[in-house]
Amino acid sequence: MTDAAVSFAKDFLAGGVAAAISKTAVAPIERVKLLLQVQHASKQITADKQYKGIIDCVVRIPKEQGVLSFWRGNLANVIRYFPTQALNFAFKDKYKQIFLGGVDKRTQFWRYFAGNLASGGAAGATSLCFVYPLDFARTRLAADVGKAGAEREFKGLGDCLVKIYKSDGIKGLYQGFNVSVQGIIIYRAAYFGIYDTAKGMLPDPKNTHIFISWMIAQSVTAVAGLTSYPFDTVRRRMMMQSGRKGTDIMYTGTLDCWRKIARDEGSKAFFKGAWSNVLRGMGGAFVLVLYDEIKKYT
């Protein structure tokens, strides 16, 4: 293998392992966030059974579905997240070579900053094309509030993908893809761009204390998450449309979804579950720091 291939493989492995560990740790927060986001578009959750907020959700889930249900959809998330993050991190460096070749970060700061934004956004959009059906399945499994057996909408990851494919075709597995690309570019641009720029401005980036790295990463994930959150809410709502027919369809398209949420639920609805998303972001910050630490030993 060439040095470039070895470097690519190390990036892929380090990013994937770090992501899988952190995602499993914050899976309960992730499920709470998803339920709050999509409950208005769920056929299973009627108006009288909707969750009032994070606390109500955390209290009711173990009572109604069991403690292990906090990790519902986590397997799909780990399977999805491993290649997603690994591809993001690996392609990020490839895109950096394209956008940042010959750029001096000390004398060409804004060009350096713009290059980091572009490389982060392009990496996120590229990987999304490959793993979107897994992201779709993770959302639908997490939104499934049935206790067990016949009450469940899907038996598992494979069952979810097969049922939606049979009812809606490949299009059903990519429901909400367009708005996802918009959101992922905004999120990844901030996630990678600001983080790399901030670290690059430090006196000795490779020997920065892990606490400083974590603080930078935490701030970046919080800002990036809140900035792109409305796009995430719309894409999750669109994912819930797959499998519906006729009068069951709530939104005719992405623009209709934006319009109806704003009209019927108010602008605050775009940020439902946002606070739990900030908490979940601690896992994202941990990924960035852990990735840098793993690379030091590979």
UniProtKB/Swiss-Prot annotation:
Solcar repeats lie at residues 6-98, 111-201, 212-297. The modification N6,N6,N6-trimethyllysine is found at residue 52. It comes from the Eukaryota. The matrix-open state (m-state) is inhibited by the membrane-permeable bongkrekic acid (BKA). The cytoplasmic-open state (c-state) is inhibited by the membrane-impermeable toxic inhibitor carboxyatractyloside (CATR). Proton transporter activity is inhibited by ADP:ATP antiporter activity. Trimethylated by ANTKMT at Lys-52. The transmembrane helices are not perpendicular to the plane of the membrane, but cross the membrane at an angle. Odd-numbered transmembrane helices exhibit a sharp kink, due to the presence of a conserved proline residue. Belongs to the mitochondrial carrier (TC 2.A.29) family. This is ADP/ATP translocase 2.
